[in-house]
């Protein structure tokens, strides 16, 4: 592996100042999704490090070293996940959203639940037109929240492999 540890806990302030030794950085909103990521020994994603559990603590994405990396963001498919995606993309404009699209929501809509409170209006100009349309769709749904930890691992692995292969 790239690091001598399978897992480690790092402060956001450290991520701001210390470049991670990987070409690809995967940002995952929720650390409960660790079980869905490919195991390094079975299905490695070369030169990839996942940072899990930052939630709304996204200020570290202003780190200059991230501009030189291939970066993806995977969050809940709800207004809060899209809100965090917008904030993240405000720091890293070239960031790629994974599994945060209408096709993913439609394919797994049976797993969706009601979102008790919608996120505030988001950072203007950071969503793609399709993401903006998705946000409107999710707000209009009775069950407009698809939490990432309930997506099938196969769907996650497929999306990650496609992202890695683009690079």
Regions found by a protein language model. Give the residues of each.
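Nucleic-acid enzyme cleavage-core boundary/entry regions
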Residues: 1-69, 80, 86-97, 103-167
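Catalytic palm subdomain of template-directed nucleic-acid polymerases
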Residues: 76
